[in-house]
């Protein structure tokens, strides 16, 4: 394959040679553009981050965290999956980090973010006996604590009449005075508490609490966009403790 043809008087480029030269110029130009971009954006955090979040956190805490994160790092593309903790753990390999409640993820770094208490919430202007008990989907141990509290507190069998798969649905049913339910402290925000009886739920002689963890592999800390998100949500956690 000839790229050049040399004669006694000149050097000529063949058709193949012209294509090779054009390609080489294009590569050199693209390399220059990349170098210029790197110099211009040196120190800027960008890239992609994928996050799996339990539904309760996705509904309550995440929107404010995400708004601040994107304000600080507008060049980052964020992908969020919201679902039950069980689903998030099952699909943990799809995410740079996961935020789950109640359970740590095996073989991951697990840092405690929040530990919230729980309260029995009852509308004030409706007779207790006329209200259905609403139960949201949760792990068996957690439901057992609620059952034991209810039966000890009211000396009656715990018999939920309404079962929902999202705790936020419990809150909305409560707003409509459909029934009574137990809600985490996080979900009480936004309710007009003057309209409800609020009673702390106990597990034996201690308050019933639910822990929220952020879980990730140490290796993802090498990605600035991921490390920045983790630092931001940890700062929020610390501010809530104060």
Model-derived regions, located:
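A short LG(V/I)-centered, amphipathic sequence patch enriched
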Residues: 1-13
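Alpha-helical linker/hinge and terminal dimerization helices associated
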Residues: 20-42
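Short loop->beta-strand "edge-of-pocket" segments that line small-molecule binding or catalytic clefts
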Residues: 52, 118-144
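Short beta-strand->loop
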Residues: 109-119, 185, 194-211, 218
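Secondary-structure junction motif
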Residues: 132-156, 222-223
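A late-sequence structural motif
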Residues: 200-242
């Amino acid at each position: 394959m000839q790229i050049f043809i040399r004669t006694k008087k000149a050097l000529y480029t063949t058709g193949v040679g012209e294509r090779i030269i054009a390609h080489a110029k294009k590569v050199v130009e693209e390399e220059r553009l990349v170098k210029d971009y790197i110099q211009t954006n040196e120190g800027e955090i960008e890239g992609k981050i994928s996050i799996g979040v339990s539904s309760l956190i996705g509904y309550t805490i995440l929107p404010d965290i995400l708004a601040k994160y994107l304000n600080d790092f507008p060049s980052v593309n964020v992908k969020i999956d919201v679902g039950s903790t069980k689903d998030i753990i099952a699909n943990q390999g799809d995410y740079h980090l996961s935020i789950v409640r109640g359970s740590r993820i095996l073989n991951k770094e697990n840092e405690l973010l929040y530990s919230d208490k729980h309260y029995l919430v009852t509308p004030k202007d409706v007779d207790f006996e006329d209200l259905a008990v609403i139960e949201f989907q949760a792990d068996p141990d957690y439901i057992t604590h609620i059952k034991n509290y209810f039966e000890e507190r009211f000396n009656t069998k715990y018999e939920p009449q309404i079962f929902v798969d999202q705790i936020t649905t419990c809150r909305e049913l409560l707003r409509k005075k459909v029934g009574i339910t137990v809600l985490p402290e996080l979900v009480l925000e936004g309710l007009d508490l003057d309209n409800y009886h609020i009673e702390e739920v106990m597990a034996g002689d201690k308050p019933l609490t639910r822990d929220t963890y952020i879980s990730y592999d140490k290796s993802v800390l090498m990605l600035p966009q991921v490390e920045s998100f983790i630092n931001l949500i940890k700062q929020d956690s610390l501010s809530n403790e104060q």
